[in-house]
From Swiss-Prot:
Protein name, UniProt field: NEDD4-like E3 ubiquitin-protein ligase WWP2
UniProt domain HECT: residue ranges: 536-870
Species classification: Eukaryota, Metazoa, Chordata, Craniata, Vertebrata
Alphabetized UniProt keyword annotations: Host-virus interaction, Nucleus, Phosphoprotein, Repeat, Transferase, Ubl conjugation, Ubl conjugation pathway
Organism, scientific name: Homo sapiens
Catalysed transformations (reactions): S-ubiquitinyl-[E2 ubiquitin-conjugating enzyme]-L-cysteine + [acceptor protein]-L-lysine = [E2 ubiquitin-conjugating enzyme]-L-cysteine + N(6)-ubiquitinyl-[acceptor protein]-L-lysine
Database matches in Pfam families: HECT (PF00632), WW (PF00397)
InterPro entries: C2_dom, C2_domain_sf, E3_ub_ligase_SMURF1, E3_ubiq-protein_ligase, HECT_dom, Hect_E3_ubiquitin_ligase, WW_dom, WW_dom_sf
């Protein structure tokens, strides 16, 4: 009967994992409100395991969905297949129906065979809380052939846990470590044939002892199924043991005894061997363990759910109660995983340290590594403490002696790897530049990789992180060491360099992905307001994707540029009472002191601040610009009396008259107060504390003029300006703009438009000059030789803005209405050119040579503050 103990080729065992070929043919789902064509796929899951879940490709069909795709699955004879038919949509997928297949029932009904078997499954779907029929799904199964004779009575399979077996004598069947040549089954797997002895196996549980009370006290005879698999005390494969009903199974439940099952221990997945039982007449051990050698009495801890056992011949194997499998190899330590590279070689992944190794890890290996790492960390800490034993410990007192003073609110200074950087907790960003020196008005920024520091004596020096050197010499062009803390010896302005520095800050702080803004042209303002204010400020740094509802198109930048242009035209429209024109004939905008007529005006100003910051951050332009004093306020610069001339000429002339005349001789009684009317309500504001009783005299006249000028720029707009700057600072920190002056900021926000030279010359008028005068010819020659940036600066120098109205130079607006570009002959040849922005007039002295005119003109448009600096 020796042949009876060998497994038959091409026959699988009920609990052996094998490959199943599943062919998904077609489906006829019942779908309400059916679309003409459906894009669908089928998802198949084995026993609900994510690792055994596969999908077909997507196919398009109408009444009948066709796939004809083959899927290979790893199953056992008791596996359950869950099939789901999905319909693909743009936003989400829709479940058309589900079906399930119990392979054990299929095998029972077909004599243990699945050879190209066709199944038509009824799909089920949920409709209003009830399960209804959802159509049909046709599949083919081609897979394992299971010998049902190994099961008691030759019929039913068990429900999922491998059951132990006993021979006819009642003694346990245990394997012997003598191997036979392997045979190949029909699924490509390999099964080994071994001889077994009748000795019982010893058990060494790793997770604790089982209570004897949990065991059944009733013995049941084992029915002979007629199969001679237990003849002469031998069974197929390894390691297989038998158990008595009194002995609990390895999964902790008592089940009827079953026939012996083949098990193939391997590093992957195997069947679960049952625990051994004592011989007839012996009482079971209450501890479930036997005396082991000293080396085995204190084994290394196994992962949860694992157990170590030993065969009679002394060979150790391991039981995984989680997956009900056995293996010869000891389980990996926690956090380790075994993988295979493309060349079929095994390697091991340590998820704890995110490292890989070819060597199989053991508990001793992990302990040695942890011990080495602990010693290494202790040694590094000791070395760091040793290297810093003579260093001066930093404290809060050191910041008190910092020549630059304390950091701005919300900023923190840190140092990693020897280099200092700064953290802005307000915007959650970091930077190398010191915010106290970044963008100083009198100093341009340091070159990339440079840093400014101070010695304990307060002497400034510079660190070049590129070459790791230090120097007292200022690396910026035109700066001399030790001259006024680095004030420029020769003026050097590069708007292009500043702009690239700003763009670098924007790109280095950009966030991934994109943000969608969907608006309608009819409700552009409100749609944009609601969406921008509902977003987190930092999300507005993501790439913009603008959608115009009702219009088809993809936004690759063009729609965003149009959105900025259209929305800026809306939000800055004076009809909303948020902004007003700076003057009757000045098309630049300033905040309207009467904006409080709108109860939500501060929220709108916060929104506009975010919007303007987005325009700068994303490099887009707006339609209309602000006044230069407003740009100065954004840069935290103090407006001057000269700035008042362009926005309120009458007020400016009044202050100039007070400045140039003796108030005591004129008999004027002025006090440090000023009246203001808003919406018909007159309010009085004190320029200084107790100003109502302080009279203006010749001694305090300068203070009065300064306070009056400041009040004129801030009257009634303090809250609005703060809300605007808060919204701006949420998206882009205002510190990033400190490199620029107010005119450069206007250029960056409003854009640099191309200038038509022929239109400029044709629309220019002359006073005390003619177009044939040599100074005029030299002037136009210089302008033609300029690049577009300098032409814009010349236009800004004369007209006060870099933007041209619709219609070009012929439509320029002055203080008294339309005013063309004018060149007037004024002054001596030693004078610099002067401009009158209210009248679009350039005072050009009669220079004697082309070189002199070019030098004076270029110097004037660069140095626009203060005249007569020869």
């Amino acid at each position: 009967m020796a042949s009876a103990s060998s497994s038959r080729a091409g026959v699988a065992l009920p609990f052996e994992k094998s490959q199943l070929t599943l062919k998904v043919v077609s489906a006829k789902p019942k779908v309400h409100n059916r679309q003409p064509r459906i894009n669908s796929y089928v998802e198949v899951a084995v026993d609900g395991l994510p690792s055994e879940t596969k999908k077909t490709g997507k196919r398009i069909g109408s009444s009948e969905l066709l796939w004809n795709e083959i899927i290979i699955l790893n199953v056992t004879a008791q596996s359950h297949l869950d099939l789901k038919v999905w319909s693909c949509h743009t936003l989400r997928n829709e479940l058309l129906g589900t079906a399930s297949v119990n392979l054990s029932n299929v095998l029972k009904n077909n004599g243990g065979k699945m050879e190209n078997m066709q199944l038509t499954l009824n799909l089920q779907t949920e409709n209003k809380g009830s399960v209804v029929s959802g159509g049909e799904l046709t599949i083919f199964l081609d897979g394992p052939t299971v010998d049902l004779g190994n099961v008691p009575n030759g019929s039913a399979l068990t429900d999922g846990s491998q059951l132990p077996s006993r021979d006819s004598s009642g003694t346990a069947v245990a394997p012997e470590n003598r191997h036979q040549p392997p045979s190949t089954n029909c699924f490509g797997g390999r099964s080994r044939t071994h001889r077994h002895s009748g000795a019982s196996a010893r058990t060494t549980p790793a997770t604790g002892e089982q209570s004897p009370g949990a065991r059944s006290r009733h013995r049941q005879p084992v029915k002979n199924s007629g199969h001679s698999g237990l003849a002469n005390g031998t069974v197929n494969d390894e390691p297989t043991t038998a158990t008595d009903p009194e002995e609990p199974s390895v999964v902790g439940v008592t089940s009827p005894p079953a026939a012996p099952l083949s098990v193939t221990p391997n590093p992957n997945t195997t069947s679960l061997p049952a625990p051994a039982t004592p011989a007839e007449g012996e009482e079971p051990s209450t501890s479930g363990t036997q005396q082991l050698p000293a080396a085995a009495q204190a084994p290394d801890a196994l992962p949860a759910g694992w157990e170590q056992r030993e065969l009679p011949n002394g060979r150790v194997y391991y039981v995984d109660h989680n997956t009900k499998t056995t293996t010869w190899e000891r389980p990996l330590p926690p956090g380790w995983e075994k993988r295979t590279d493309p060349r079929g070689r095994f390697y091991y992944v340590d998820h704890n340290t995110r490292t890989t190794t070819w060597q199989r890890p053991t508990a001793e290996y992990v302990r040695n590594y942890e011990q080495w790492q602990s010693q290494r960390n202790q040694l590094q800490g000791a070395m760091q403490h040793f290297s810093q034993r003579f260093l001066y410990q930093s404290s809060s007192a050191s910041t008190d002696h910092d020549p630059l003073g304390p950091l701005p609110p919300g900023w923190e200074k840190r140092q990693d790897n020897g280099r200092v950087y700064y953290v802005n907790h307000n915007t959650r960003t970091t930077q190398w530049e010191d915010p106290r020196t970044q963008g100083m008005i009198q100093e341009p920024a340091l070159p990339p990789g440079w840093e400014m520091k101070y010695t304990s004596e307060g002497v400034r020096y510079f660190v070049d992180h590129n070459t790791r050197t230090t120097t007292f010499k200022d690396p910026r062009p035109g700066f001399e060491s030790g001259t006024k803390q680095g004030s420029p010896g020769a003026y050097d302005r590069s708007f292009r360099w500043k702009y690239h520095q700003f763009r670098f800050l924007c790109h280095s702080n950009a966030l991934p992905s994109h943000v969608k803004i969907s608006v309608s042209r009819q409700t552009l303002f409100e749609d944009s307001f609601q969406q921008i204010m509902n977003m987190k400020p930092y999300d507005l740094r993501r790439r913009l994707y603008i959608i115009m509802r009702g219009e088809e198109g993809l936004d690759y930048g063009g729609i965003a540029r149009e959105w900025f242009f259209l929305l800026s035209h809306e939000v800055l429209n004076p009809m909303y009472c948020l902004f007003e024109y700076a003057g009757k004939n000045n098309y630049c905008l300033q905040i309207n002191p009467a904006s409080s007529i709108n109860p939500d005006h501060l929220t709108y100003f916060r929104f506009i601040g975010r919007f303007i910051a987005m325009a700068l951050y994303h490099g887009k332009f707006i339609d209309t610009g602000f006044t230069l004093p407003f740009y100065k306020r954004m840069l935290n610069k103090r407006p001057t009396l000269k700035d008042l001339e362009s926005i309120d000429p009458e007020f400016y002339n009044s202050i100039v008259w007070i400045k140039e005349n003796n108030l005591e001789e004129c008999g004027l009684e002025l006090y440090f107060i000023q009246d203001m009317e808003i919406l018909g309500k007159v309010t009085t504001h004190e320029l200084k504390e107790g100003g109502e009783s302080i009279r203006v005299t010749e001694e305090n006249k300068e203070e009065y003029i300064m306070l009056l000028t400041d009040w004129r720029f801030t009257r009634g707009v303090e809250e609005q300006t703060k809300a605007f700057l808060d919204g701006f600072n949420e998206v882009a920190p205002l510190e990033w703009l400190r490199y620029f002056d107010e005119k450069e900021l206007e250029l960056m926000l409003c854009g640099m438009q191309e200038i038509d030279m022929s239109d400029w010359q044709k629309s220019t008028i002359y006073r005390h000059y003619t177009k044939n005068s040599k100074q005029i010819q030299w002037f136009w020659q210089v302008v033609k030789e300029m690049d577009n940036e300098k032409r814009i600066r010349l236009l800004q120098f004369v007209t006060g803005t870099c933007r041209l109205p619709v219609g070009g130079f012929a439509e320029l607006i002055g203080s008294n209405g339309p005013q063309k570009f004018c060149i007037d002959k004024v002054g001596k040849e030693t004078w610099l050119p002067r401009s009158h922005t209210c009248f679009n007039r350039l005072d050009l002295p009669p220079y004697k040579s082309y070189e002199q005119l070019r030098e004076k003109l270029l110097y004037a448009i660069e140095e626009t503050e203060g005249f007569g600096q020869e």
